[in-house]
Amino acid sequence: IVGASETIMQGTEESAAVHHREDGQFGVFVPLTDSEVTQITDKGVTVQQDFSLDFHQGQATLRIYQAREKIDLFAPEQGAELPMQGEILLEQHYAEKHELGLGDTLTVGGRDFIVAGIGSTPDYDATYEKTSDTTVDSNLFGVGFVTAEDYEALKAGGQNFRTEDYTYTYLLNGAMTDQELKELLQQAKDNNVKSVILDAYEWQLTNTGLPQEQMNDAIDK
């Protein structure tokens, strides 16, 4: 069992590297200005705007992101890696539970989308709606990715039932530590930083449901 666990974890790490799994993320109350983002990227850190909108799909919630190009890239099991306008990429378990396949039409926020890809992303290996959740239910929550133009159209349509979430993901690239980035953020935008999730502990907890010490015990054994 331990050998199988190590193989799965190794495969997960390899996939995470290929698809640029985030080193961490931070949320803000107000989007950063271009100059504030530049203050971070000039230090050698890669930053990606990863805002999202939540929509009702019957009893379920579908969280929509703009398709990613730098961090936490979509890994298709079927179909496309990036959507064209009018297309959507869906997390595979949500698609399965809702019997959605390539070429199907899905209506989100009053707009019709063609399902062009089905797969996963490193930050949603387990699709928890909130980091505090302890169970995954793909009947009730999933994620999708659309073009920048379609994302803006959905936002303008106003049918999202929660306000837009302002999250940024980052890759440190060896330029600084998580703590140094956190301090830089707090200096750059007083009272604006809502949350900072540092990857070393939080990512494991969010994506496995196991505390870090249990993960370490599994590796040691």
Over which residues does each language-model region extend?
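Membrane transport/envelope proteins' first extracytoplasmic loop
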Residues: 1-221
